[in-house]
Structure formats: structure tokens, C-alpha cells
């Protein structure tokens, strides 16, 4: 089972926010997931709001989960390597 760390879209029409989730790569974007590890709100003022549980992220990265490109950027922003 290939596991990805990716964004799950939530929110209203034209007002999205995203949850950072660990999911099987074969499941749909907004479908079933294994664990939620944070959230990302690009609409927040004055700048985008990012909150990620560093311990959970490190655990999943250590277990071989592959983050998507956007999630990699969010991890760098949050100080997670």
C-alpha cells in the first residue's frame, strides 16, 4: 500500500480550506483517509494559516509516507524536515 501525505479539500464553494491527511494513494482526494495531521487555510488574513502536528508528520515520514509537492512546501513553512 503506497501512502501519501496530501491535502483534502473542505469548506464552501469559493472558500476552501484544506486538511493535511495521510491516505492510501489509490483513494480519491476527498475520500477515505488514515489519519489527519493538520490543516491549511489559504484564505486567512493577513497570511495563510498552517498548523501541522510535527510528531505525527515525522512518524509518517519515518514509516515511508510520501508528501505531495504542496505538502512539502507546507512542511518547510512549518519547519518540518
Swiss-Prot record:
Origin: domain of life: Bacteria
Record-level Gene Ontology MF annotations: structural constituent of ribosome
Pfam family, one: Ribosomal_S16
Keywords annotated in UniProt: Ribonucleoprotein, Ribosomal protein
Record's GO cellular component terms: cytoplasm; small ribosomal subunit
Family: Belongs to the bacterial ribosomal protein bS16 family.
The protein's name in its UniProt record: Small ribosomal subunit protein bS16
Organism field: Clostridium perfringens (strain 13 / Type A)
Amino acid at each position: 500500500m503506497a501512502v501519501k501525505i496530501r491535502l483534502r479539500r473542505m469548506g464552501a464553494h469559493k472558500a476552501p480550506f484544506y486538511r493535511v491527511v495521510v491516505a492510501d494513494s489509490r483513494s480519491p482526494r476527498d475520500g477515505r483517509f488514515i489519519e489527519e495531521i493538520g490543516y491549511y487555510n489559504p484564505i486567512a488574513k493577513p497570511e495563510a494559516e498552517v498548523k501541522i502536528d510535527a510528531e505525527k508528520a515525522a512518524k509518517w515520514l519515518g514509516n515511508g509516507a510520501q508528501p505531495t509537492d504542496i505538502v512539502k512546501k507546507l512542511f518547510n513553512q512549518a519547519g518540518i524536515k
